A protein has these predicted regions:
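Secondary-structure boundary elements
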Residues: 63-135, 185
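Amphipathic alpha-helical repeat scaffolds of TPR domains
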Residues: 224, 232-251, 274-296, 322-336, ...
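Short coil turns that delineate tetratricopeptide repeat
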Residues: 270-271, 317, 324, 358, ...
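Hydrophobic/aromatic-rich core segments of domains that either
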Residues: 146-217, 281
Length: 510
C-alpha cells in the first residue's frame, strides 16, 4: 500500500504514540527493502529428511530413500500435493515390482521387466532438459537423469542390486547379478541399463516392447557419451537431479534457488571420499563464487556480497577454489572503492576481510588502500601540502606496512616532480636543483628525480659558464671572477667551473 494513502487513512484519529509506532514500522520496512537479501547458505533439505537411519554413511540407499531423495532434489517437497501424489504412485510401483509375478522371474528378467513397467505406465516422451523425478512420473516427460533415478528406486524395490553410472554427458544404471557362467567365485555379472529408451536393458539387444504405440519418443544415446564412466553412490546419483537444476539456475542467474539446492546436494555426500563427491563440492563452490562475482558497480552494495561470501566460507570451509575467488572479490571491492574514492569503506572492508585472503592479496590490497587514501586525500592540494600530508601519513605507526609505504612513495615522488617540473618550465634551474636535493633526502632511489636534478645541474653550470665567458671575452676579469666564485659556492666540485677558474688565472697572470 502506498505510504501517502496509508497515512491519509489513519492519521486523523491517531495519537502521538500511534504515529511514532507507525513511523518506526515504516522506517524499518524501508530499511529492509533497501538491503540486498542474499541467498541462504543452508541446505534446502537435510539427510534426516530422507534417511531412515541418519547415521548410515554407506553408498547404498533403500528404494524409499532413493525416491524421497530424488523428489527433494527435484524441489518437490514430500508434503506438497505433487510430492504426496508421487509417493502414492511409487507405492503402487513398489507393490507391482515386489509382487509374486515379478519375484518369480530370474533376476535378469526382473531387471528388464522393471524398465518395461516404467515405459508401459509412466515414461512417454524424452526431453533433454527434463531432469525432475516428479515431472517424469506425473507427465511422462523424462531425460537420462530423471529416468535413471526412477529406475534405480524401482529396481531396488524389486530386490535388485543396482548402481548409478555417470559420465560428463550422461547418466545410466548398472544391474549387478550373480555370475552363473563360471569364472571367479563371487564375481558379479554387470548389465548396463540405458533408461532413456524402452530397449535399454543390456543395450545392443533387441526385443519387443508392450504398448510400444504409447511411447511418443525416446532417445538413443551416442556411443561417445559413455566415455570416462564413473560408478557413483546412490546419494551422488540421485543428487545429479539437483546438479542439473543448479546448472539451469546459473543460466537464469537465480542463485537464491541454486545455492541452497547445491548445498543440500553436497550435504548428502559430505562424508563420502570419492571423485564424484569432490565434484559436488566443486559445483557448490562454483555457485557461491559465481554469485560473489556478480557485476555490481556500487562499492557499498558489493561489500555485502563479499561479506555474504565470507559467511559461506565460514559455513562450508575454505577450499583452493574459494580462496582464489575470495582474493578476487576483495580486489574487485577495493577497485570499486578506488573508483568512488571511498577510503573509509575500503579500510573497513580490508580490516574485516583480511583473515580470509592470502598474504599476496593482502599486499596488493595495501597498495590499493594507499591509492584510495592518497587519491581522495590529495585531490586539489598544492604540491607542497601534498608532500606534508604524505610525510605525516608515512610516519604514523598504522601505516608502516611495506606495500602501503611503497605506494605512498609513488605519490610523494609525483608531488616532488610537480614542483621540479614547474621550476624547469620557468627556467629557475638553481631553485630546481636545490629542491631536487631536498627531494632526494626523502626519495634517495628515485631515478626520475635524479634525472631531472642532472638537467638542473647541467643548465646551472651552462649559465654560469656562459656568463663567465661573456665577462672574460669583454676583458672584465673582476666580474668574470665574481661569476665563477658565486657559482663555485653552490657547485664547488664542478670540473667545468674549475677549468674556467684555471683559465681565468692564466689570463690574468700576465
Amino acid at each position: 500500500m502506498p505510504k501517502k494513502l496509508f497515512y491519509r487513512c489513519i492519521s486523523y484519529r491517531m495519537n502521538k504514540k500511534n504515529i511514532l509506532v507507525i513511523s518506526i514500522f515504516l522506517f524499518i520496512c524501508a530499511f529492509c527493502f533497501s538491503q540486498k537479501i542474499h541467498p541462504s547458505i543452508e541446505p534446502v533439505f537435510l539427510p534426516e529428511d530422507v534417511l531412515v537411519n541418519a547415521n548410515r554413511a554407506g553408498w547404498s540407499l533403500s528404494a524409499d530413500e532413493v525416491f524421497r531423495l530424488a523428489l527433494l532434489c527435484s524441489e518437490c517437497p514430500l508434503d506438497s500435493e505433487a510430492g504426496e501424489k508421487c509417493l502414492l504412485i511409487f507405492e503402487k510401483i513398489k507393490a507391482e515390482v515386489s509382487s509374486d509375478d515379478f519375484m518369480q522371474l530370474e533376476l535378469e528378467e526382473r531387471g528388464r521387466a522393471v524398465l518395461k513397467l516404467l515405459y508401459r505406465d509412466y515414461l512417454t516422451t524424452y526431453d533433454f532438459h527434463q531432469t525432475r523425478t516428479d515431472v517424469a512420473l506425473l507427465t511422462g516427460v523424462y531425460n537420462c537423469v530423471s529416468s535413471g533415478v526412477l529406475y534405480m528406486a524401482a529396481a531396488k524395490a524389486a530386490g535388485l542390486e543396482v548402481r548409478g553410472q555417470k559420465t560428463t554427458e550422461h547418466a545410466f544404471c548398472t544391474v549387478y547379478l550373480p555370475n552363473t557362467s563360471g569364472g571367479k567365485t563371487n564375481q558379479l555379472k554387470k548389465i548396463d541399463v540405458e533408461t532413456t529408451n524402452p530397449y535399454g536393458f543390456n543395450p545392443g539387444t533387441r526385443e519387443t516392447i508392450e504398448n510400444e504405440d504409447k511411447i511418443q519418443s525416446y532417445y538413443v544415446v551416442p556411443k561417445k557419451y559413455y566415455a570416462n564412466r564413473q560408478e557413483v553412490s546412490d546419494r551422488i546419483f540421485a543428487g545429479l537431479i539437483a546438479g542439473n537444476l543448479c546448472s539451469y539456475y546459473i543460466e537464469q542467474n537465480n542463485y537464491e534457488k541454486a545455492i541452497p539446492l547445491g548445498a543440500a546436494r553436497y550435504e548428502f555426500v559430505l562424508q563420502e571420499k570419492s571423485k564424484a563427491a569432490n565434484e559436488a563440492r566443486r559445483d557448490l563452490d562454483v555457485l557461491a563464487s559465481n554469485y560473489v562475482n556478480t557485476d555490481i558497480q556500487d562499492a557499498k552494495l558489493f561489500s555485502g556480497y563479499v561479506e555474504w561470501f565470507t559467511g559461506f566460507i565460514d559455513r562450508w570451509g575454505m577450499t583452493d577454489y574459494l580462496q582464489k575467488n575470495m582474493d578476487t572479490a576483495l580486489y574487485n571491492l577495493l577497485v570499486l572503492c578506488l573508483q568512488q574514492k571511498d577510503f573509509p569503506l575500503a579500510e573497513a572492508s580490508f580490516n574485516k576481510f583480511k583473515p580470509y585472503i592470502t598474504q599476496k592479496q593482502a599486499a596488493t590490497s595495501q597498495e590499493i588502500l594507499a591509492d584510495i587514501f592518497f587519491d581522495s586525500g590529495l585531490e586539489g592540494l598544492p604540491a607542497e601540502e601534498q608532500i606534508e600530508l604524505i610525510n605525516q601519513t608515512l610516519s604514523q605507526p598504522q601505516n608502516q606496512d611495506e606495500a602501503f609505504q611503497k605506494r605512498a612513495q609513488h605519490y610523494l615522488e609525483n608531488a616532488w616532480l610537480m614542483i621540479l617540473n614547474n621550476c624547469m618550465n620557468i627556467r629557475d634551474y638553481e631553485t630546481g636543483f636545490q629542491k631536487s636535493e631536498e627531494a632526494l633526502q626523502y626519495l634517495p632511489k628515485s631515478s626520475k628525480i635524479k634525472k631531472i636534478q642532472k638537467a638542473f645541474y647541467d643548465n646551472c653550470i651552462a649559465i654560469i659558464h656562459n656568463n663567465f665567458a661573456e665577462q672574460a671575452n669583454a676583458q672584465r676579469f673582476d666580474q668574470a671572477r665574481q661569476v665563477l666564485e658565486a657559482g663555485m659556492q653552490v657547485f664547488p666540485d664542478d670540473k667545468t667551473l674549475k677549468n674556467d677558474l684555471n683559465l681565468l688565472n692564466r689570463m690574468t697572470a700576465n
